[in-house]
């Protein structure tokens, strides 16, 4: 369950998108029914390549991790983190996605990258493993890919500042509504 006293990363990404005029790209096609069920199934399926990659790299996959920045009052619910078996600190975060399109680069999806960089900030790391299950509308069949994406700290910090501005806009909006 979400902490009602904290701002969730996804809320801040949605607000940043709205402020930037990107809110129209959020909603799925009307032809996709019960999209959350497909997403949950894809998330379960796409854990397998993460586990396989962890076996190859002597790493562990901690699933369903909640990270908080209590100073900034922000919480993130990650699909997981990757750690070396003998280290307590994350090497990478895991963010599992499903897309109803042909295979493409996740770097082209602004929302994905904004969410991932926020999670990286919370986890104090710079690498994301992003398994994506693609459901194309035509040929070919379903495709699964595991992307490993590294960001510069400066990119992560710039994204974090964008989300802090979105948080502040939500706070200002709430104050104005009460007046």
Language model feature labels by segment:
Residues 1-92, 110:
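Metal-dependent nuclease catalytic cores that hydrolyze phosphodiester bonds in DNA/RNA
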Residues 60, 93-95, 127-132:
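A structural signal for short, well-ordered beta-strand segments and their strand-loop junctions
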Residues 85, 99-101, 135-137:
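Short coil/turn motifs at secondary-structure junctions
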Residues 95-108:
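Short beta-strand-loop-alpha-helix junction that forms the active-site gateway
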Residues 106-109, 122-179:
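Metal-dependent nuclease catalytic regions and adjoining charged, substrate-binding loops involved
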């Amino acid at each position: 369950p979400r902490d009602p006293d904290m701002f969730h990363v996804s809320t801040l990404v949605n607000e940043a998108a709205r402020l930037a005029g990107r809110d129209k790209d959020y909603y799925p096609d009307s032809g996709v029914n019960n999209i959350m069920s497909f997403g949950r199934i894809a998330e379960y399926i796409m854990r397998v390549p993460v586990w396989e990659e962890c076996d190859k790299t002597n790493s562990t996959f901690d699933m369903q991790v909640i990270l908080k920045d209590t100073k900034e009052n922000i919480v993130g619910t990650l699909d997981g983190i990757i750690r070396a078996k003998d280290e307590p600190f994350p090497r990478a975060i895991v963010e599992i996605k499903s897309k109803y399109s042909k295979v493409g680069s996740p770097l082209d999806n602004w929302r994905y990258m904004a969410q991932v960089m926020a999670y990286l900030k919370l986890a104090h790391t710079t690498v994301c493993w992003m398994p994506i299950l693609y459901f194309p509308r035509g040929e070919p069949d379903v495709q699964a890919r595991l992307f490993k994406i590294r960001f510069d700290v400066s990119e992560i910090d710039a994204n974090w500042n964008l989300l802090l501005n979105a948080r502040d806009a939500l706070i200002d909006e709430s104050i104005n509504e009460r007046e």
